[in-house]
């Protein structure tokens, strides 16, 4: 984490909880589109005595688009709802990928990946490039633009069917495979991640524990502003001492990550 206080790498499992929320939006999108539009014909229903309930059951839809006009008007909306659910997953993966790229670089060095999952530099033999995560990030950022593309393509269309709607397929359908590939690539990378041990033993991280020392004084009854000032003065005077451990926790924090 980039804030200046200690945490644990398990805190970076937040994408798991984010993906759990993303699944809620995917289920919601599925519920929106799991309705039978057949029988709406050119947009105003059929003059034949068809049984739309029967076709709904035979095709496995959960329900009907009852209003035949809405069955046509829902085109564009259905694609946009699905695209947004895909974009939510893509957003989670792109952020995860950015963090992985950041934590891999030499200024952090928090994580490591096997050589076969990284690429070398064109001129620097010591460097390992996180190309897989960079490609995931780029693909997912493109998917995040998809809801806006669909919104713009369907703006100001009057009720009914229009040939404009045909173009939605070539934007939406490839996104399913792209996102699936990104999920699989992320899974492969994370299954091979290596976390650096004893990161906080590095001298440059000693001031991360300044907050913990302030908290100790506060818990001992010293007002926060006074504790804050004391630790700050100790740091300026070169007298700051600390223990490289954290004594507190709560639900969802260090050592207590459950959901």
What is each stretch, according to the model?
Residues 109, 124-259:
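Glycine-rich cofactor/substrate-binding loops
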Residues 1-3, 18, 22, 99, ...:
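Acidic side chains
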Residues 2-10:
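Short, small-residue-biased leader/transition segments that mark boundaries at the very start
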Residues 1-2, 30, 201:
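Short, surface-exposed helix-loop/turn micro-motifs enriched in polar/charged residues
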């Amino acid at each position: 984490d980039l804030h200046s206080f200690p945490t644990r790498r398990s805190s970076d499992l937040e994408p798991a909880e984010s993906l759990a929320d993303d699944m809620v939006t995917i289920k919601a999108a599925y519920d929106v589109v799991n309705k039978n539009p057949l029988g709406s014909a050119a947009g105003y229903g059929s003059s034949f005595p068809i049984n739309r309930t029967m076709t709904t059951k035979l095709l496995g839809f959960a329900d009907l688009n009852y209003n035949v006009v809405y069955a046509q008007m829902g085109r564009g909306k259905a694609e946009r709802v699905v695209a947004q659910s895909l974009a939510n997953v893509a957003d989670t993966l792109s952020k995860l990928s950015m963090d992985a790229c950041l934590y891999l670089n030499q200024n952090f060095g928090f994580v490591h990946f096997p050589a076969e999952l990284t690429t070398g530099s064109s001129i620097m033999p010591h460097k390992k490039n996180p190309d897989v995560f960079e490609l995931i990030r780029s693909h997912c950022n493109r998917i995040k633009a998809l809801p806006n593309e669909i919104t713009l393509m369907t703006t100001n269309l009057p009720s009914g069917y229009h040939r404009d709607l045909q173009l939605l397929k070539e934007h939406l359908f490839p996104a399913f495979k792209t996102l699936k590939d990104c999920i699989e690539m992320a899974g492969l990378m994370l299954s091979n991640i290596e976390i650096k041990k004893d990161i906080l033993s590095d001298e440059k991280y000693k001031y991360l524990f300044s907050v913990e020392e302030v908290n100790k004084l506060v818990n001992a009854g010293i007002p926060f502003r006074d504790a804050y000032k004391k630790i700050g003065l100790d740091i300026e005077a070169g007298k700051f001492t600390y223990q490289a451990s954290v004594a507190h926790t709560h639900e969802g924090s260090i050592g207590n990550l459950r959901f």
